[in-house]
Amino acid sequence: MTNLLEDLSFRGLIQQMTDEEGLNKQLNEEKIRLYSGFDPTADSLHIGHLLPILTLRRFQLAGHHPIALVGGATGLIGDPSGKKAERTLNTQDIVVEWSQKIKNQLSRFLDFEAGENPAVIANNFDWIGKLSIIEFLRDVGKNFGINYMLAKDTVSSRIETGISYTEFSYMILQSYDFLNLYREKNCKLQIGGSDQWGNITAGLELIRKSEEEGAKAFGLTIPLVTKADGTKFGKTEGGAIWLDKEKTSPYEFYQFWINTDDRDVVKYLKYFTFLSKEEIEAYAEKTETAPEKREAQKRLAEEVTVLVHGREALEQAVHISQALFSGNIKELSAQDVKVGFKDVPSFEKDRSEELSLVDVLVESKLSPSKRQAREDIQNGAVYINGERQTDIGHLLTAEDRIEDQFTVLRRGKKKYFLITY
């Protein structure tokens, strides 16, 4: 086994592989071209896309030539894989716009200027968009038997609930991508999530039927990322964790990784970082012997946040996290508060308005009544910008505002409210 496949195996990144011996031989003999596809089903990639992206990067670091394929055409159709119902089709204008955004995001992870093996971005609309219906049916469709397609999980799982011809044909279009890249770019390997196995093997079958005998192409799937507690990876109460900082702030992104379960953290270090085997094994031991220190989680959060958002964003995320943990909220800038308290309930007040702390506690619903608000203050349960306030007659002034824009109220340990001005 090549060093690359050994590393992927150590990291648990190989779910299934076609012709392991043949692929191993191919990787030993030459630096190959490989691809993974990303359909623009939203205006940003999310952390579920990180695994195939980083796997492409691992191949590039080993000297191979990655192709990131944006599905400008297949994104108009919709992949039935893993879906229980028909997707809502997006307009071409939206798919074009999203394709460009995804292309920009991919450029953060792959080196498009590497001297000997630069990554390449392709868009399957460039060839599928030119394909006439006659060409599609005669040259591509004739290679697929209905029984063969019905046997694939992506189709068979939808027979009961129903599947349109549009989504039924997705497998054929993705197969045509592989054939086109094989012919035009000499691309010999497709990588995808475990739910793509049926589509990948269909592409290999199309290459086998369409090309001369002895055509060499391979498929490799990576595992579905799971969580030990059974909840869906990449989702929080606030929704998906996106790679776009406007949709998921670097602070929220960092916090997602910091909160990784001890049972998952070593697996995620293998999946999502480029730490060596020795470093990962050292963190595994630390998690075993001193889990309360959460050293592995901190390193995981640092590595992935830098990878996706850069060093400066990591430093801001760490600063906000430390300030919130210690209660030193006054140390934060207005921008930090805006990021760190994005999902906290809030209302807006005029700076000239006289605000009684008791009234604000009731209006914000931190306290159910004025009587309870006074008790909360007297009992030391109320904090303004992290500092305890015990004066029941306190009026909020400019001194209670962070950069004259925000006041952060807290009752007890976890109930926050944000006043904006």
UniProtKB/Swiss-Prot annotation:
GO BP, sorted A to Z: tyrosyl-tRNA aminoacylation
GO molecular function per UniProt: ATP binding; RNA binding; tyrosine-tRNA ligase activity
Chain positions of motif 'HIGH' region: 40-49
Binding-site list for ATP: 235
Key words, A-Z: Aminoacyl-tRNA synthetase, ATP-binding, Cytoplasm, Ligase, Nucleotide-binding, Protein biosynthesis, RNA-binding
InterPro entries xrefs: aa-tRNA-synth_I_CS, aa-tRNA-synth_Ic, Rossmann-like_a/b/a_fold, S4_RNA-bd, S4_RNA-bd_sf, SYY-like_C, Tyr-tRNA-ligase, Tyr-tRNA-ligase_bac-type
Cellular component per GO, a single term: cytosol
Localization of this protein: Cytoplasm
Domain S4 RNA-binding: 355-421
Reactions that this protein is recorded to catalyse: tRNA(Tyr) + L-tyrosine + ATP = L-tyrosyl-tRNA(Tyr) + AMP + diphosphate + H(+)
Enzyme class: ligase
Pfam families associated with the record: SYY_C-terminal, tRNA-synt_1b
Chief place where the protein resides: cytoplasm
EC number, UniProt record: 6.1.1.1
Motif 'KMSKS' region: positions: 232-236
Family in the record: Belongs to the class-I aminoacyl-tRNA synthetase family. TyrS type 1 subfamily.
Assembly and interaction partners: Homodimer.
Protein purpose: Catalyzes the attachment of tyrosine to tRNA(Tyr) in a two-step reaction: tyrosine is first activated by ATP to form Tyr-AMP and then transferred to the acceptor end of tRNA(Tyr).
PANTHER family in the record: TYROSINE--TRNA LIGASE, MITOCHONDRIAL, TYROSYL-TRNA SYNTHETASE
Name this polypeptide is given: Tyrosine--tRNA ligase
Species whose genome carries this gene: Bacillus velezensis (strain DSM 23117 / BGSC 10A6 / LMG 26770 / FZB42)
